[in-house]
Amino acid sequence: MNTFFSRLITVVACFFIFSAAWFCLWSISLHLVERPELAALLFPFGLRLGLMLQCPRGYWPVLLGAEWLLVYWLAQEVALAHLPLLMIGSVLTLLPVALTSRYRHQRDWRTLLLQGAALTAAALLQSLPWLGQGEEAWNALLLTLTGGLTLAPICLVFWHYLTSTTWLPLGPSLVSQPVNWRGRHLIWYLLLFIVSLWLQLGLPAELSRFTPFCLALPIIALAWHYGWQGALIATLMNAIALIASQTWHDHPVDLLLSLLAQSLTGLLLGAGIQRLRELNQSLQKELARNHRLAERLLETEESVRRDVARELHDDIGQTITAIRTQAGIVQRLAADNGGVKQSGQLIEQLSLGVYDAVRRLLGRLRPRQLDDLTLAQAIRSLLREMELESRGIVSHLDWRIDETALSESQRVTLFRVCQEGLNNIVKHANASAVTLQGWQQDERLMLVIEDDGSGLPPGSHQQGFGLTGMRERVSALGGTLTISCTHGTRVSVSLPQRYV
């Protein structure tokens, strides 16, 4: 029983609200076209069709019945002509609305174009019974197209707002909360409306021919900032400005054509902007997905490097130790045999060389410092191991990065960039000083390696010297690596602290 009364109250409220809005829009339309029956085909048609495209089918009889009652009442009061044509046309419009009603809850650019096509088809069907009335058939088509494309998209905007907003019941907890008026958006809308109104009313007579082109300015501005909703709201502002300047038009057809043109512009531009935004969102998701995959690949690569380094260290290290031990035994057993003793010493030296080579290889595969030290300590250890001071290179480290904010991939990447950059400086730069700086800035990790040497040879920025691998690692984490050689070489790395 409660459900029945709730439904009944909703239906009655919809009936009276729609009837009041329909009559107000009919009065405005009558001011523009000055014929009662044609006025019903302008904005009232757009209101009824716009609501039918958005609301469930159960409310269609309420809207259609309210319109028929109003049309019948107007026929008695103001001698409204062609009453059967209006009613037959309104029934015919149910066909395209019914075909597109299943897609009304979608929120993509295709919905805008689909509803635009439904509006066009409904306008054709509404004006179809007027074919026997001569020139009035074209007037009916122009009126229905203009009214439908002007008001129906606005119904879509309001319906989207009402259905996408979370509504909470009014309670004591909400009374004390301030109202968010979103003043910046309101001021932005108001300024554009004033500009649009001034362009229609305030331009000199010699510039009046440019006023139709000015209608696109608010549409473009709001579409750029707010997407398809902004484009459709801009068409409503333009429609109000055009109606306010109706006295400047020599013929109502000029006004209707202007309304129709700017409504089509708003609808198509809104669909285009929505399509562009959807593509951008899709590209951003794919880019984020690719970066996540690349980061996982880096983590997998480091895991494999760590396992290989451990196996090399355990197996080859033990083997080399055994070789050195056996070589020492041979030397002691053959102390009187100079040739054998010399061969034992050579074997021991070669095994030491192999051990050093394997040790360097292990350092390249997986820096052992990262397993035992923090990143700052690992970089200091790297500076000591490279013996820069013995090579006449003064080093300075300024590290201000919080390591708790770093992922394992970022730690390894920053260390390897430092490792490769220092190797290039030692081998090619002929530098006397090198500076490493690391800091956090605006949710980004910054690393700069700078020396006062001769710079990299020409053409080495794109290939060689480990730069390709460095760039690939940094790019895989969503960062950038730049190299400049103005005074020495400067390697700059910028990584997002957390890639989303």
Swiss-Prot record:
Name of the protein in its database record: Signal transduction histidine-protein kinase/phosphatase UhpB
Compartments (UniProt record): Cell inner membrane
Maturation and modification: Autophosphorylated.
PANTHER family, sorted: NITRATE/NITRITE SENSOR PROTEIN NARX-RELATED (PTHR24421), SIGNAL TRANSDUCTION HISTIDINE-PROTEIN KINASE_PHOSPHATASE UHPB (PTHR24421:SF58)
Stretches assigned to the Cytoplasmic side: 274-500
Pfam family, one: HisKA_3
GO molecular function (one): phosphorelay sensor kinase activity
Primary location group: membrane
Residue(s) carrying Phosphohistidine: 313
Reaction(s) the record says it catalyses: ATP + protein L-histidine = ADP + protein N-phospho-L-histidine
Annotated TM spans: 8-28, 78-98, 112-132, 140-160, 185-205, 207-224, 231-249, 253-273
EC number, as in UniProt: 2.7.13.3, 3.1.3.-
InterPro entries: HATPase_C_sf (IPR036890), His_kinase_dom (IPR005467), MASE1 (IPR007895), Sensor_HK_TwoCompSys (IPR050482), Sig_transdc_His_kin_sub3_dim/P (IPR011712)
Domain Histidine kinase: 311-499
UniProt cross-references to CDD domains, sorted A to Z: HATPase_UhpB-NarQ-NarX-like (cd16917)
Protein purpose: Part of the UhpABC signaling cascade that controls the expression of the hexose phosphate transporter UhpT. UhpB functions as a membrane-associated protein kinase that autophosphorylates in response to interaction with UhpC, and subsequently transfers its phosphate group to the response regulator UhpA. Can also dephosphorylate UhpA.
Keyword terms of this UniProt record: ATP-binding, Cell inner membrane, Cell membrane, Hydrolase, Kinase, Membrane, Nucleotide-binding, Phosphoprotein, Protein phosphatase, Transferase, Transmembrane, Transmembrane helix, Two-component regulatory system
Membrane topology, record value: Multi-pass membrane protein
Any one cellular-component term (Gene Ontology): plasma membrane
Gene Ontology biological process terms in this record: signal transduction
